Protein backbone atom coordinates (compact mmCIF):
# COMPACT_ATOMS: atom_id res chain seq x y z
CA UNK A 1 0.00 0.00 0.00
CA UNK A 2 1.61 3.21 -1.18
CA UNK A 3 2.12 6.09 1.22
CA UNK A 4 0.17 8.61 -0.86
CA UNK A 5 -2.86 6.30 -0.74
CA UNK A 6 -3.02 6.35 3.05
CA UNK A 7 -4.42 9.45 4.68
CA UNK A 8 -7.41 10.50 6.71
CA UNK A 9 -10.74 11.52 5.22
CA UNK A 10 -12.54 14.53 6.55
CA UNK A 11 -14.82 14.65 9.53
CA UNK A 12 -17.96 15.52 7.53
CA UNK A 13 -21.81 15.27 7.80
CA UNK A 14 -24.29 15.50 10.61
CA UNK A 15 -25.37 12.99 13.20
CA UNK A 16 -28.67 11.24 12.43
CA UNK A 17 -30.57 11.40 15.69
CA UNK A 18 -32.91 8.65 14.64
CA UNK A 19 -30.11 6.10 14.33
CA UNK A 20 -28.39 4.32 17.18
CA UNK A 21 -25.23 5.91 18.57
CA UNK A 22 -22.27 3.96 17.21
CA UNK A 23 -18.96 3.96 19.05
CA UNK A 24 -15.86 4.77 17.01
CA UNK A 25 -13.45 1.98 16.35
CA UNK A 26 -10.61 2.67 18.79
CA UNK A 27 -8.39 -0.31 18.18
CA UNK A 28 -4.96 -0.30 16.54
CA UNK A 29 -4.02 3.01 14.95
CA UNK A 30 -5.22 3.20 11.36
CA UNK A 31 -4.79 5.80 8.70
CA UNK A 32 -7.93 5.87 6.58
CA UNK A 33 -11.58 6.58 6.84
CA UNK A 34 -14.06 5.26 4.30
CA UNK A 35 -16.17 8.06 2.90
CA UNK A 36 -19.29 5.92 3.14
CA UNK A 37 -18.84 5.83 6.90
CA UNK A 38 -18.35 9.53 7.48
CA UNK A 39 -21.91 10.14 8.59
CA UNK A 40 -21.72 7.58 11.39
CA UNK A 41 -20.98 9.46 14.56
CA UNK A 42 -20.76 8.75 18.24
CA UNK A 43 -22.47 10.26 21.22
CA UNK A 44 -20.40 10.46 24.36
CA UNK A 45 -23.03 11.65 26.80
CA UNK A 46 -26.67 12.59 27.02
CA UNK A 47 -26.05 16.33 26.88
CA UNK A 48 -23.55 16.75 24.07
CA UNK A 49 -22.88 14.72 20.96
CA UNK A 50 -19.33 14.44 19.70
CA UNK A 51 -19.19 13.31 16.14
CA UNK A 52 -16.39 11.11 14.91
CA UNK A 53 -15.88 8.88 11.87
CA UNK A 54 -15.71 5.12 11.83
CA UNK A 55 -12.11 4.17 11.03
CA UNK A 56 -11.37 1.37 8.60
CA UNK A 57 -8.54 0.42 6.25
CA UNK A 58 -8.78 -0.36 2.57
CA UNK A 59 -7.33 -3.74 3.31
CA UNK A 60 -10.72 -4.71 4.73
CA UNK A 61 -12.47 -6.42 1.87
CA UNK A 62 -15.86 -6.81 3.51
CA UNK A 63 -18.10 -3.79 3.91
CA UNK A 64 -19.36 -3.75 7.51
CA UNK A 65 -22.98 -3.18 8.39
CA UNK A 66 -22.44 -0.02 10.40
CA UNK A 67 -26.05 0.29 11.50
CA UNK A 68 -25.85 -3.11 13.16
CA UNK A 69 -22.21 -2.93 14.20
CA UNK A 70 -21.53 -4.01 17.79
CA UNK A 71 -20.55 -1.25 20.23
CA UNK A 72 -16.89 -0.61 20.91
CA UNK A 73 -17.40 -1.92 24.45
CA UNK A 74 -20.18 -3.94 26.09
CA UNK A 75 -19.23 -2.43 29.43
CA UNK A 76 -21.79 0.28 30.17
CA UNK A 77 -21.10 3.47 32.13
CA UNK A 78 -21.89 1.87 35.50
CA UNK A 79 -19.66 -1.12 34.80
CA UNK A 80 -16.87 1.18 33.62
CA UNK A 81 -17.08 3.14 36.85
CA UNK A 82 -17.01 -0.13 38.79
CA UNK A 83 -13.85 -1.04 36.85
CA UNK A 84 -12.37 2.35 37.73
CA UNK A 85 -13.02 1.71 41.43
CA UNK A 86 -11.58 -1.81 41.24
CA UNK A 87 -8.45 -0.66 39.38
CA UNK A 88 -8.03 2.37 41.61
CA UNK A 89 -8.29 0.26 44.76
CA UNK A 90 -5.52 -1.97 43.42
CA UNK A 91 -3.37 0.95 42.29
CA UNK A 92 -3.93 2.68 45.61
CA UNK A 93 -1.45 0.32 47.26
CA UNK A 94 1.26 1.29 44.80
CA UNK A 95 0.97 5.00 45.58
CA UNK A 96 0.37 4.40 49.28
CA UNK A 97 3.41 2.15 49.72
CA UNK A 98 5.64 5.10 48.89
CA UNK A 99 3.83 7.85 50.80
CA UNK A 100 3.08 5.81 53.92
CA UNK A 101 6.83 5.24 54.35
CA UNK A 102 7.96 8.89 54.32
CA UNK A 103 7.05 9.82 57.94
CA UNK A 104 9.05 6.88 59.36
CA UNK A 105 12.32 7.57 57.53
CA UNK A 106 13.83 9.13 60.65
CA UNK A 107 12.46 6.29 62.78
CA UNK A 108 14.05 3.68 60.50
CA UNK A 109 17.31 5.64 60.60
CA UNK A 110 17.40 5.51 64.41
CA UNK A 111 16.06 1.94 64.69
CA UNK A 112 18.82 0.42 62.55
CA UNK A 113 21.55 2.98 63.40
CA UNK A 114 22.14 4.03 59.80
CA UNK A 115 22.84 7.36 58.06
CA UNK A 116 20.42 9.57 56.14
CA UNK A 117 21.99 8.44 52.85
CA UNK A 118 21.36 4.77 53.70
CA UNK A 119 17.76 5.32 54.73
CA UNK A 120 17.19 7.19 51.46
CA UNK A 121 18.46 4.07 49.67
CA UNK A 122 15.29 2.26 50.80
CA UNK A 123 13.34 4.91 48.89
CA UNK A 124 15.70 4.81 45.90
CA UNK A 125 15.47 1.03 45.39
CA UNK A 126 11.69 1.25 45.62
CA UNK A 127 11.63 3.73 42.74
CA UNK A 128 14.10 1.68 40.69
CA UNK A 129 12.01 -1.47 40.86
CA UNK A 130 8.82 0.54 40.53
CA UNK A 131 10.17 1.60 37.14
CA UNK A 132 11.67 -1.68 35.93
CA UNK A 133 8.84 -4.08 36.84
CA UNK A 134 6.05 -2.43 34.77
CA UNK A 135 8.38 -2.35 31.77
CA UNK A 136 8.63 -6.14 31.84
CA UNK A 137 5.14 -6.95 33.11
CA UNK A 138 3.43 -4.52 30.73
CA UNK A 139 4.39 -6.71 27.78
CA UNK A 140 2.94 -9.74 29.57
CA UNK A 141 -0.32 -7.88 30.21
CA UNK A 142 -0.58 -6.90 26.54
CA UNK A 143 -0.05 -10.52 25.45
CA UNK A 144 -1.45 -12.80 28.17
CA UNK A 145 -4.19 -10.49 29.42
CA UNK A 146 -4.68 -7.95 32.18
CA UNK A 147 -6.29 -10.16 34.83
CA UNK A 148 -3.54 -12.83 35.32
CA UNK A 149 -0.80 -10.20 35.66
CA UNK A 150 -2.82 -8.17 38.18
CA UNK A 151 -3.45 -11.26 40.32
CA UNK A 152 0.24 -12.18 40.25
CA UNK A 153 1.32 -8.61 41.10
CA UNK A 154 -1.00 -8.26 44.10
CA UNK A 155 0.04 -11.69 45.41
CA UNK A 156 3.74 -10.74 45.34
CA UNK A 157 3.00 -7.42 47.04
CA UNK A 158 0.95 -9.13 49.75
CA UNK A 159 3.85 -11.46 50.60
CA UNK A 160 6.42 -8.63 50.56
CA UNK A 161 4.37 -6.54 53.01
CA UNK A 162 4.23 -9.44 55.47
CA UNK A 163 8.00 -9.86 55.13
CA UNK A 164 8.62 -6.15 55.77
CA UNK A 165 6.46 -6.23 58.88
CA UNK A 166 8.68 -9.01 60.24
CA UNK A 167 12.06 -7.64 59.00
CA UNK A 168 14.91 -7.66 61.54
CA UNK A 169 17.79 -6.11 59.57
CA UNK A 170 18.39 -3.17 57.26
CA UNK A 171 19.37 -5.54 54.44
CA UNK A 172 16.04 -7.34 54.71
CA UNK A 173 14.19 -4.05 54.42
CA UNK A 174 16.11 -3.10 51.28
CA UNK A 175 15.48 -6.46 49.58
CA UNK A 176 11.81 -6.62 50.54
CA UNK A 177 11.24 -3.02 49.45
CA UNK A 178 12.52 -4.08 46.04
CA UNK A 179 10.10 -7.01 45.99
CA UNK A 180 7.25 -4.83 47.22
CA UNK A 181 7.78 -2.31 44.42
CA UNK A 182 8.24 -4.99 41.77
CA UNK A 183 5.00 -6.62 42.86
CA UNK A 184 2.56 -3.73 42.91
CA UNK A 185 3.98 -1.18 40.45
CA UNK A 186 2.81 -2.93 37.23
CA UNK A 187 -0.84 -2.38 38.15
CA UNK A 188 -0.56 1.36 37.44
CA UNK A 189 0.35 0.67 33.79
CA UNK A 190 -2.15 -2.18 33.55
CA UNK A 191 -4.90 0.10 34.85
CA UNK A 192 -4.22 2.40 31.90
CA UNK A 193 -4.49 -0.64 29.65
CA UNK A 194 -7.84 -1.62 31.14
CA UNK A 195 -9.24 1.89 30.67
CA UNK A 196 -7.92 1.94 27.09
CA UNK A 197 -9.65 -1.39 26.40
CA UNK A 198 -13.14 -0.22 27.37
CA UNK A 199 -13.23 3.52 26.53
CA UNK A 200 -13.13 5.67 23.42
CA UNK A 201 -10.96 8.73 22.99
CA UNK A 202 -13.82 11.14 23.64
CA UNK A 203 -14.45 9.76 27.15
CA UNK A 204 -10.98 8.45 27.99
CA UNK A 205 -9.60 11.62 29.54
CA UNK A 206 -12.29 11.66 32.19
CA UNK A 207 -11.83 8.02 33.15
CA UNK A 208 -8.05 8.40 33.26
CA UNK A 209 -8.57 11.39 35.54
CA UNK A 210 -10.94 9.44 37.79
CA UNK A 211 -8.66 6.45 38.16
CA UNK A 212 -5.58 8.63 38.67
CA UNK A 213 -7.48 10.67 41.23
CA UNK A 214 -8.52 7.62 43.22
CA UNK A 215 -5.02 6.19 43.03
CA UNK A 216 -3.44 9.41 44.23
CA UNK A 217 -5.47 9.16 47.43
CA UNK A 218 -2.59 6.93 48.52
CA UNK A 219 -0.23 9.87 48.09
CA UNK A 220 -2.72 12.28 49.64
CA UNK A 221 -3.38 10.38 52.85
CA UNK A 222 -0.64 7.72 52.92
CA UNK A 223 1.73 9.84 54.98
CA UNK A 224 -1.02 10.71 57.44
CA UNK A 225 -1.98 7.04 57.81
CA UNK A 226 1.67 6.03 58.20
CA UNK A 227 2.29 8.66 60.85
CA UNK A 228 -0.81 7.68 62.80
CA UNK A 229 -0.05 3.96 62.72
CA UNK A 230 3.62 4.42 63.54
CA UNK A 231 3.04 6.78 66.47
CA UNK A 232 0.51 4.35 67.99
CA UNK A 233 1.84 0.86 67.17
CA UNK A 234 5.34 1.41 65.74
CA UNK A 235 6.71 1.47 62.21
CA UNK A 236 5.98 -2.23 61.57
CA UNK A 237 2.25 -1.57 61.78
CA UNK A 238 2.29 0.30 58.47
CA UNK A 239 3.33 -2.87 56.64
CA UNK A 240 0.73 -4.97 58.48
CA UNK A 241 -1.83 -2.40 57.37
CA UNK A 242 -0.68 -2.73 53.74
CA UNK A 243 -0.70 -6.53 54.00
CA UNK A 244 -4.29 -6.61 55.25
CA UNK A 245 -5.47 -4.10 52.65
CA UNK A 246 -3.76 -5.87 49.76
CA UNK A 247 -5.11 -9.22 50.96
CA UNK A 248 -8.65 -7.88 50.73
CA UNK A 249 -7.80 -6.41 47.32
CA UNK A 250 -6.53 -9.80 46.14
CA UNK A 251 -9.80 -11.50 47.12
CA UNK A 252 -11.86 -8.84 45.33
CA UNK A 253 -9.68 -9.09 42.21
CA UNK A 254 -9.97 -12.89 42.07
CA UNK A 255 -13.76 -12.71 42.24
CA UNK A 256 -14.65 -9.52 40.36
CA UNK A 257 -11.89 -8.30 38.02
CA UNK A 258 -12.85 -9.19 34.42
CA UNK A 259 -10.47 -9.65 31.53
CA UNK A 260 -10.63 -6.65 29.17
CA UNK A 261 -7.78 -7.24 26.69
CA UNK A 262 -9.38 -6.87 23.28
CA UNK A 263 -7.31 -9.64 21.71
CA UNK A 264 -8.89 -12.03 24.24
CA UNK A 265 -12.44 -10.76 24.90
CA UNK A 266 -13.06 -8.26 22.07
CA UNK A 267 -15.58 -5.71 23.28
CA UNK A 268 -16.19 -7.83 26.39
CA UNK A 269 -18.68 -10.25 24.84
CA UNK A 270 -16.21 -13.11 24.19
CA UNK A 271 -15.52 -15.59 26.99
CA UNK A 272 -11.74 -16.09 27.50
CA UNK A 273 -10.38 -19.56 26.74
CA UNK A 274 -7.98 -19.55 29.67
CA UNK A 275 -9.72 -20.08 33.00
CA UNK A 276 -7.24 -17.72 34.68
CA UNK A 277 -8.66 -14.91 32.54
CA UNK A 278 -12.23 -15.63 33.68
CA UNK A 279 -13.71 -13.83 36.66
CA UNK A 280 -16.23 -15.84 38.73
CA UNK A 281 -18.47 -12.77 38.61
CA UNK A 282 -19.17 -13.51 34.93
CA UNK A 283 -21.06 -16.64 35.92
CA UNK A 284 -24.01 -14.56 37.14
CA UNK A 285 -26.85 -14.47 34.56
CA UNK A 286 -27.33 -10.69 34.83
CA UNK A 287 -23.67 -10.02 33.98
CA UNK A 288 -23.74 -12.55 31.15
CA UNK A 289 -26.75 -10.83 29.60
CA UNK A 290 -25.22 -7.37 29.91
CA UNK A 291 -21.96 -8.43 28.26
CA UNK A 292 -23.69 -10.65 25.65
CA UNK A 293 -21.49 -13.57 26.68
CA UNK A 294 -24.04 -16.04 25.30
CA UNK A 295 -23.97 -14.25 21.94
CA UNK A 296 -20.28 -13.34 21.51
CA UNK A 297 -19.29 -10.77 18.90
CA UNK A 298 -16.13 -12.37 17.57
CA UNK A 299 -15.67 -9.64 14.95
CA UNK A 300 -14.58 -7.28 17.74
CA UNK A 301 -11.55 -9.44 18.57
CA UNK A 302 -8.28 -7.76 17.63
CA UNK A 303 -5.17 -9.54 16.31
CA UNK A 304 -2.97 -11.03 19.00
CA UNK A 305 0.39 -9.40 19.62
CA UNK A 306 3.59 -11.35 20.09
CA UNK A 307 5.01 -11.51 23.59
CA UNK A 308 8.01 -9.22 23.89
CA UNK A 309 9.42 -8.22 27.25
CA UNK A 310 11.59 -5.61 25.55
CA UNK A 311 8.71 -3.96 23.66
CA UNK A 312 9.09 -0.67 25.59
CA UNK A 313 12.56 -0.23 24.11
CA UNK A 314 11.04 -0.11 20.62
CA UNK A 315 8.43 2.39 21.80
CA UNK A 316 11.26 4.67 22.94
CA UNK A 317 12.05 5.26 19.25
CA UNK A 318 8.70 7.00 18.74
CA UNK A 319 9.34 10.76 18.81
CA UNK A 320 6.09 11.66 20.57
CA UNK A 321 6.76 9.16 23.34
CA UNK A 322 10.40 10.13 23.89
CA UNK A 323 9.48 13.81 24.29
CA UNK A 324 6.69 13.00 26.74
CA UNK A 325 9.02 10.72 28.71
CA UNK A 326 11.54 13.49 29.30
CA UNK A 327 9.03 16.18 30.24
CA UNK A 328 6.74 14.08 32.45
CA UNK A 329 9.66 12.13 33.92
CA UNK A 330 11.57 15.19 35.16
CA UNK A 331 8.40 16.74 36.58
CA UNK A 332 7.49 13.56 38.50
CA UNK A 333 11.07 13.14 39.75
CA UNK A 334 11.08 16.71 41.07
CA UNK A 335 7.80 16.12 42.89
CA UNK A 336 9.10 12.84 44.40
CA UNK A 337 12.33 14.53 45.54
CA UNK A 338 10.30 17.25 47.23
CA UNK A 339 8.26 14.53 49.03
CA UNK A 340 11.43 12.92 50.39
CA UNK A 341 13.03 16.23 51.37
CA UNK A 342 9.90 17.31 53.23
CA UNK A 343 10.14 14.41 55.68
CA UNK A 344 13.78 15.10 56.52
CA UNK A 345 13.29 18.86 56.84
CA UNK A 346 10.24 18.58 59.09
CA UNK A 347 12.05 16.18 61.40
CA UNK A 348 15.48 17.85 61.61
CA UNK A 349 14.78 21.54 60.96
CA UNK A 350 11.36 21.92 62.54
CA UNK A 351 11.70 19.09 65.10
CA UNK A 352 8.20 17.71 64.52
CA UNK A 353 6.94 14.37 65.79
CA UNK A 354 6.03 11.54 63.40
CA UNK A 355 2.31 12.26 63.81
CA UNK A 356 2.74 15.96 62.98
CA UNK A 357 4.94 15.12 59.99
CA UNK A 358 2.07 13.01 58.64
CA UNK A 359 -0.32 15.94 59.00
CA UNK A 360 2.08 18.18 57.09
CA UNK A 361 1.75 15.93 54.03
CA UNK A 362 -1.97 16.68 53.75
CA UNK A 363 -1.61 19.91 51.68
CA UNK A 364 0.61 18.08 49.20
CA UNK A 365 -1.68 15.09 48.91
CA UNK A 366 -4.95 16.98 48.68
CA UNK A 367 -3.59 19.39 46.05
CA UNK A 368 -2.25 16.45 44.03
CA UNK A 369 -5.67 14.82 44.16
CA UNK A 370 -7.37 18.01 42.96
CA UNK A 371 -4.76 18.37 40.22
CA UNK A 372 -5.26 14.93 38.71
CA UNK A 373 -9.06 14.81 38.90
CA UNK A 374 -9.45 18.34 37.51
CA UNK A 375 -7.00 17.78 34.66
CA UNK A 376 -8.88 14.63 33.59
CA UNK A 377 -12.20 16.45 33.46
CA UNK A 378 -10.53 19.33 31.63
CA UNK A 379 -9.24 16.94 28.95
CA UNK A 380 -12.76 15.66 28.26
CA UNK A 381 -14.17 19.18 28.03
CA UNK A 382 -11.30 20.32 25.81
CA UNK A 383 -11.69 17.35 23.47
CA UNK A 384 -15.42 17.96 22.93
CA UNK A 385 -14.98 21.70 22.40
CA UNK A 386 -12.04 21.45 20.02
CA UNK A 387 -13.55 18.59 18.03
CA UNK A 388 -16.82 20.49 17.54
CA UNK A 389 -14.88 23.56 16.33
CA UNK A 390 -12.78 21.42 14.01
CA UNK A 391 -15.86 19.89 12.40
CA UNK A 392 -17.39 23.32 11.75
CA UNK A 393 -14.09 24.60 10.33
CA UNK A 394 -13.76 21.55 8.09
CA UNK A 395 -17.24 22.10 6.67
CA UNK A 396 -16.35 25.74 5.95
CA UNK A 397 -13.14 24.72 4.19
CA UNK A 398 -15.04 22.28 2.03
CA UNK A 399 -17.46 25.00 0.93
CA UNK A 400 -14.58 27.39 0.20
CA UNK A 401 -12.87 24.82 -2.01
CA UNK A 402 -16.11 24.21 -3.90
CA UNK A 403 -17.34 27.80 -4.34
CA UNK A 404 -14.17 29.90 -4.62
CA UNK A 405 -11.95 27.46 -6.48
CA UNK A 406 -14.59 25.72 -8.56
CA UNK A 407 -13.63 22.22 -7.50
CA UNK A 408 -16.08 19.36 -7.72
CA UNK A 409 -17.06 17.42 -4.62
CA UNK A 410 -14.82 14.54 -5.70
CA UNK A 411 -11.84 16.87 -6.16
CA UNK A 412 -12.48 18.46 -2.76
CA UNK A 413 -12.60 15.03 -1.20
CA UNK A 414 -9.24 14.12 -2.77
CA UNK A 415 -7.67 17.36 -1.52
CA UNK A 416 -8.92 16.78 2.00
CA UNK A 417 -7.82 13.16 1.89
CA UNK A 418 -4.22 14.02 1.07
CA UNK A 419 -3.59 17.11 3.18
CA UNK A 420 -2.63 16.52 6.86
CA UNK A 421 -3.84 19.98 7.88
CA UNK A 422 -7.44 18.75 7.66
CA UNK A 423 -6.85 16.02 10.26
CA UNK A 424 -8.03 16.69 13.82
CA UNK A 425 -4.97 17.62 15.90
CA UNK A 426 -5.17 15.25 18.86
CA UNK A 427 -1.67 16.12 20.11
CA UNK A 428 -2.53 19.80 20.52
CA UNK A 429 -5.83 18.91 22.17
CA UNK A 430 -4.09 16.88 24.86
CA UNK A 431 -1.01 19.06 25.49
CA UNK A 432 -1.95 22.70 24.84
CA UNK A 433 -2.26 23.48 28.58
CA UNK A 434 0.94 21.69 29.63
CA UNK A 435 3.20 24.78 29.59
CA UNK A 436 1.20 26.75 32.12
CA UNK A 437 1.06 23.88 34.61
CA UNK A 438 4.77 23.10 34.22
CA UNK A 439 5.87 26.69 34.79
CA UNK A 440 3.58 27.17 37.80
CA UNK A 441 4.75 23.96 39.45
CA UNK A 442 8.41 24.81 38.79
CA UNK A 443 8.03 28.20 40.45
CA UNK A 444 6.32 26.52 43.40
CA UNK A 445 9.17 24.06 43.91
CA UNK A 446 11.77 26.85 43.73
CA UNK A 447 9.87 28.84 46.37
CA UNK A 448 9.55 25.68 48.49
CA UNK A 449 13.33 25.17 48.50
CA UNK A 450 14.14 28.75 49.47
CA UNK A 451 11.50 28.77 52.22
CA UNK A 452 13.41 25.88 53.79
CA UNK A 453 16.76 27.67 53.46
CA UNK A 454 15.62 30.91 55.07
CA UNK A 455 13.81 28.94 57.80
CA UNK A 456 10.49 30.51 56.92
CA UNK A 457 7.42 29.74 59.06
CA UNK A 458 6.15 26.19 58.63
CA UNK A 459 2.94 27.47 57.04
CA UNK A 460 4.95 29.03 54.17
CA UNK A 461 6.72 25.74 53.47
CA UNK A 462 3.43 23.81 53.41
CA UNK A 463 1.68 26.40 51.23
CA UNK A 464 4.46 26.25 48.63
CA UNK A 465 4.46 22.45 48.80
CA UNK A 466 0.72 22.38 48.13
CA UNK A 467 0.92 25.01 45.38
CA UNK A 468 3.62 23.09 43.49
CA UNK A 469 1.71 19.81 43.86
CA UNK A 470 -1.48 21.44 42.57
CA UNK A 471 0.07 21.74 39.10
CA UNK A 472 2.90 19.20 39.03
CA UNK A 473 0.87 16.09 38.23
CA UNK A 474 -1.24 17.60 35.42
CA UNK A 475 1.43 16.67 32.88
CA UNK A 476 1.14 13.03 33.97
CA UNK A 477 -2.58 12.97 33.15
CA UNK A 478 -1.98 14.76 29.83
CA UNK A 479 0.87 12.41 28.87
CA UNK A 480 -0.84 9.20 29.95
CA UNK A 481 -4.01 10.04 28.03
CA UNK A 482 -2.08 10.91 24.86
CA UNK A 483 0.02 7.75 25.11
CA UNK A 484 -3.15 5.64 25.39
CA UNK A 485 -4.50 7.49 22.32
CA UNK A 486 -1.34 6.81 20.32
CA UNK A 487 -0.99 3.15 21.36
CA UNK A 488 -4.53 1.90 22.13
CA UNK A 489 -3.51 -1.75 21.62
CA UNK A 490 -0.28 -1.51 23.67
CA UNK A 491 -1.30 0.75 26.51
CA UNK A 492 0.26 -1.30 29.32
CA UNK A 493 3.58 -1.45 27.49
CA UNK A 494 3.57 2.24 26.58
CA UNK A 495 2.57 3.51 30.02
CA UNK A 496 5.05 1.07 31.55
CA UNK A 497 7.73 2.81 29.50
CA UNK A 498 6.64 6.18 30.94
CA UNK A 499 6.68 4.69 34.42
CA UNK A 500 10.21 3.32 33.90
CA UNK A 501 11.62 6.67 32.91
CA UNK A 502 9.99 8.72 35.65
CA UNK A 503 10.84 6.22 38.40
CA UNK A 504 14.49 5.88 37.37
CA UNK A 505 14.81 9.66 37.31
CA UNK A 506 13.19 9.82 40.76
CA UNK A 507 15.66 7.25 42.06
CA UNK A 508 18.56 9.27 40.63
CA UNK A 509 17.36 12.57 42.10
CA UNK A 510 16.56 11.13 45.54
CA UNK A 511 19.86 9.24 45.63
CA UNK A 512 21.71 12.52 45.09
CA UNK A 513 19.45 14.63 47.30
CA UNK A 514 21.45 14.46 50.54
CA UNK A 515 24.80 15.40 48.99
CA UNK A 516 23.24 18.04 46.75
CA UNK A 517 21.50 19.65 49.73
CA UNK A 518 24.79 19.71 51.63
CA UNK A 519 26.69 21.42 48.84
CA UNK A 520 23.93 23.54 47.25
CA UNK A 521 21.35 23.95 50.07
CA UNK A 522 17.71 23.05 49.45
CA UNK A 523 17.13 26.38 47.74
CA UNK A 524 19.84 25.62 45.21
CA UNK A 525 18.62 22.04 44.71
CA UNK A 526 15.05 23.03 43.87
CA UNK A 527 16.15 26.01 41.79
CA UNK A 528 18.18 23.57 39.70
CA UNK A 529 15.28 21.10 39.48
CA UNK A 530 12.80 23.87 38.67
CA UNK A 531 15.03 25.13 35.86
CA UNK A 532 15.42 21.57 34.59
CA UNK A 533 11.63 21.14 34.53
CA UNK A 534 11.14 24.40 32.64
CA UNK A 535 13.85 23.41 30.16
CA UNK A 536 12.25 20.00 29.62
CA UNK A 537 9.05 21.76 28.52
CA UNK A 538 10.78 23.26 25.47
CA UNK A 539 10.52 20.10 23.30
CA UNK A 540 6.75 20.31 23.72
CA UNK A 541 6.81 23.32 21.36
CA UNK A 542 8.17 21.03 18.64
CA UNK A 543 5.59 18.36 19.46
CA UNK A 544 2.68 20.81 19.40
CA UNK A 545 3.79 22.16 16.03
CA UNK A 546 4.70 18.89 14.30
CA UNK A 547 3.02 16.18 16.37
CA UNK A 548 0.12 15.62 13.97
CA UNK A 549 2.38 15.19 10.94
CA UNK A 550 4.78 12.93 12.86
CA UNK A 551 1.94 10.70 14.04
CA UNK A 552 0.36 10.43 10.57
CA UNK A 553 3.69 9.60 8.95
CA UNK A 554 4.38 6.86 11.48
CA UNK A 555 0.89 5.41 11.05
CA UNK A 556 1.30 5.25 7.29
CA UNK A 557 4.57 3.39 7.62
CA UNK A 558 3.00 0.95 10.08
CA UNK A 559 0.03 0.36 7.78
CA UNK A 560 2.34 -0.17 4.82
CA UNK A 561 4.33 -2.72 6.83
CA UNK A 562 1.15 -4.52 7.88
CA UNK A 563 -0.14 -4.54 4.30
CA UNK A 564 3.15 -5.95 3.03
CA UNK A 565 3.20 -8.63 5.72
CA UNK A 566 -0.40 -9.53 4.87
CA UNK A 567 0.37 -9.82 1.16
CA UNK A 568 3.38 -12.04 1.88
CA UNK A 569 1.25 -14.24 4.12
CA UNK A 570 -1.47 -14.47 1.45
CA UNK A 571 1.06 -15.41 -1.23
CA UNK A 572 2.55 -18.04 1.04
CA UNK A 573 -0.89 -19.48 1.81
CA UNK A 574 -1.78 -19.49 -1.88
CA UNK A 575 1.46 -21.28 -2.77
CA UNK A 576 0.87 -23.87 -0.06
CA UNK A 577 -2.68 -24.37 -1.35
CA UNK A 578 -1.47 -24.97 -4.90
CA UNK A 579 1.18 -27.38 -3.65
CA UNK A 580 -1.48 -29.27 -1.72
CA UNK A 581 -3.71 -29.45 -4.82
CA UNK A 582 -0.88 -30.78 -6.97
CA UNK A 583 -0.43 -33.64 -4.53
Swiss-Prot record:
Pfam families: MFS_1
Domain of life of the organism encoding this protein: Eukaryota
Protein's membrane topology: Multi-pass membrane protein
UniProt-annotated glycosylation sites, renumbered to this chain: 60, 120, 267, 380
Consequence of gene disruption: Leads to intracellular accumulation of clotrimazole.
A cellular component term, taken from the record's GO annotations: plasma membrane
PANTHER family: MAJOR FACILITATOR SUPERFAMILY, QUINIDINE RESISTANCE PROTEIN 1-RELATED
Protein family (similarity comment): Belongs to the major facilitator superfamily. CAR1 family.
Name of the protein this chain belongs to: Multidrug transporter QDR2
Organism of provenance: Candida glabrata (strain ATCC 2001 / BCRC 20586 / JCM 3761 / NBRC 0622 / NRRL Y-65 / CBS 138) (Yeast)
Gene: QDR2
Amino acid sequence: MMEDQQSLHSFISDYDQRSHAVEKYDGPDLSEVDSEDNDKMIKTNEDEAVKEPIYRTRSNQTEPDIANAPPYSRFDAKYKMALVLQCAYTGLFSTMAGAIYYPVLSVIEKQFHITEELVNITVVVYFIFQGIAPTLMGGLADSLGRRPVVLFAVTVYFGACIGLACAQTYAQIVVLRCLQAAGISPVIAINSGIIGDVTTRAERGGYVGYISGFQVLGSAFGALIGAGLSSRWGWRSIFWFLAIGSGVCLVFSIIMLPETKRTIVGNGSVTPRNYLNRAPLLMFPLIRRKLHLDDPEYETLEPRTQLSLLAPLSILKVKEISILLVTAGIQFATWSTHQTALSTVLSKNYHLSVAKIGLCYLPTGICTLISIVTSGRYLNWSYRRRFAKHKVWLKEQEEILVKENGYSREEVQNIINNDPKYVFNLVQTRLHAAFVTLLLSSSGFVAFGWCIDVKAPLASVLVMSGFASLFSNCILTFSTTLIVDIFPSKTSTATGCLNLFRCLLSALFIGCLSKMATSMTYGGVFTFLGALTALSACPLFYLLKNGREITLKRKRKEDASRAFALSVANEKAEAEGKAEESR
